[in-house]
A protein has these predicted regions:
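Intrinsically disordered, low-complexity N-terminal regions enriched in serine/proline/glycine
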Residues: 18-19, 171, 226
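Short alpha-helical segments used as structural interaction elements across diverse proteins
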Residues: 29-32, 106, 226
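Extracytoplasmic/periplasmic C-terminal soluble domains
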Residues: 181-262
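A structural signal for short, hydrophobic/glycine-enriched beta-strand patches
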Residues: 55-218
Length: 262
């Protein structure tokens, strides 16, 4: 028979050993979970990064956007047919002579409007600081009777100021497919229903041209972030219709405006 002290020490040693084994097993399990999580997370990140260079990523974003519901609108807006085209400006750039011209986004929207107009002549409303240049391009291509809203500086103002510029219930909305969901939402918030007429981006998706696909993916990611921002915390820099006068909406800006005044 062992002495009491030896037995106590042996019992304590066994308990410590069991605790150690349990602790070791738990740590091994924890490290396995961390390892699996790291592998799955790393694989997911790599797959997402790779997908940015392929067409399906941006196509999936456009599809998801198409499923998003619009805010409630007046029944008249829901039941009436489109009565005008609304073209949202996409930006300006400079040519080799340092003259201001439409950038490729705005140019594609102008071309989309021209094609739609020739198929179904309806009034064309040009919204944004790009309106004078959009109007000049359309007039050069045989389209007149344009209605310009020159004051808006962002999508929220596009909708508010267009609604103030001319009474509309339902329009064909022309912008790119990534911007479309956010733009339609803003117009719906201002009581205007919209049928999308997406304009193409400057470059097309192409499995053989990863850089083109990345351009689409970057645009898609930006619009996802902008849409969420608009829903969670509306733009602080969006002026209300009462903050601008009718004269401001009618007054063109920039070099094209000066030429037309002369």
């Amino acid at each position: 028979m062992w002495p009491k002290k030896s037995w106590s020490k042996r019992l304590l040693s066994k308990r410590l050993w069991r605790y150690y084994l349990r602790f070791s097993e738990r740590m091994v399990t924890l490290f396995r979970i961390i390892n699996i999580t790291f592998i799955l997370g790393s694989t997911s990140v790599i797959l997402v990064i790779i997908s940015l260079f392929t067409p399906p990523f941006s196509q999936a974003i456009v599809y998801i956007f198409s499923l998003l519901p619009l805010p409630d609108m007046p029944s008249a807006a829901m039941s009436s047919p489109p009565t005008a085209y609304v073209v949202l400006g996409g930006g300006l750039t400079n040519d080799h002579n340092n003259q201001i011209i439409l950038n490729r986004y705005s140019l594609n929207r102008a071309r989309t409007a021209a094609g739609a107009y020739h198929d179904l002549p309806l009034p064309i409303v040009l919204s944004g600081a790009e309106a004078p240049w959009l109007g000049q391009w359309l007039m050069e291509h045989g389209i007149d009777g344009l209605i310009s809203e020159n004051a808006s500086m962002n999508t929220c103002e596009n909708a508010r100021f267009t609604a103030k510029r001319i009474p509309l219930r339902h329009v064909y909305l022309i912008t790119d497919s990534y911007h479309m969901a956010r733009a339609r939402r803003q117009f719906a918030l201002n009581g205007i229903n919209s049928t999308p007429l997406p304009a193409p981006l400057p470059v097309r998706r192409d499995w053989m041209k990863p850089a083109y696909n990345l351009s689409h993916s970057r645009r898609a990611v930006y619009e996802v972030a902008a849409y969420l921002r608009d829903v969670i915390r509306p733009q602080m820099d969006c002026r209300h219709a009462k903050d601008v006068t009718s004269q401001q909406l009618l007054t063109p800006r920039g070099s094209v405006a000066k030429n037309s005044d002369e």
